[in-house]
């Protein structure tokens, strides 16, 4: 598949800068994959599309305030975006990074010391500190995507209502639409709710730069499927994934049989689905692995048609934008 098949035209004003208020007032496009039918709803109506035999799977990862500003010796500021712990040190994306050197001390927060350990390439460095998680809680900022204006309101909104397990550098944005009211409605409709963890890295939002989609190398992300969730999924008549991170978690487990580990699974058209029957997701960036996953789930032409309808109907796009519910795709098409 050529990467330019993931391109589409999007007016700048359709990129959402803040979530709907309340969150479940966002719009919901429902796409029935077998019939190719498209209908328009509000997200709080989601429970009417679910029922007994369904399992709705959430990613309960929590975004950490991973963006930190530090000072070099002699002055000069560097922005560090912490991506995860590696053997007693932390991998961080540094901007600017050309003046960093192994062994260089950095000062952050209230004079707390960090040390540059090793260059990893592509602007990434290993950094060591006495209590990096504590430092981030005290002095870190939320790592908003570059297309969202960094306001206090945006930072406060960049978390799902059910986030529990810290570890992500980016949010599982399909979950932004959920409220306590919607979750209660799902259970009242007879569906079960199950939870997994996948800690989202920045590679999730990285554009595909290779000409051939198959040549793209996927990032690794930690995932875990609790035993209770595994049983619920195995017993379900229909598995409804909330977001592409849940898809990658469940499909990684289904392929490997491993409930906890790291996944670099890249899902694009031609993938053989094993675990997911319905998908709730946002409207994604062009040339993204996320859009490739959605096309694999529902078919390229139908997804292109749905995106054209979304632009025409003025849906809101990207992290704080509206949602789509894809029914009868993925494993259901086998």
UniProtKB/Swiss-Prot annotation:
Domain of life: Bacteria
Name of a matching Pfam family: Queuosine_synth
Gene Ontology biological process terms, A to Z: queuosine biosynthetic process; tRNA wobble guanine modification
Enzyme Commission number: 2.4.99.17
Pathway: tRNA modification; tRNA-queuosine biosynthesis
Alphabetically ordered keywords of this record: Cytoplasm, Queuosine biosynthesis, S-adenosyl-L-methionine, Transferase
GO molecular function: S-adenosylmethionine:tRNA ribosyltransferase-isomerase activity
Catalytically driven reaction(s): 7-aminomethyl-7-carbaguanosine(34) in tRNA + S-adenosyl-L-methionine = epoxyqueuosine(34) in tRNA + adenine + L-methionine + 2 H(+)
Compartments, as annotated in UniProt: Cytoplasm
Record-level GO cellular component terms: cytoplasm
Assembly and oligomerization: Monomer.
Family assignment from sequence similarity: Belongs to the QueA family.
Role summary: Transfers and isomerizes the ribose moiety from AdoMet to the 7-aminomethyl group of 7-deazaguanine (preQ1-tRNA) to give epoxyqueuosine (oQ-tRNA).
Protein name: S-adenosylmethionine:tRNA ribosyltransferase-isomerase
UniProt source species: Rubrobacter xylanophilus (strain DSM 9941 / JCM 11954 / NBRC 16129 / PRD-1)
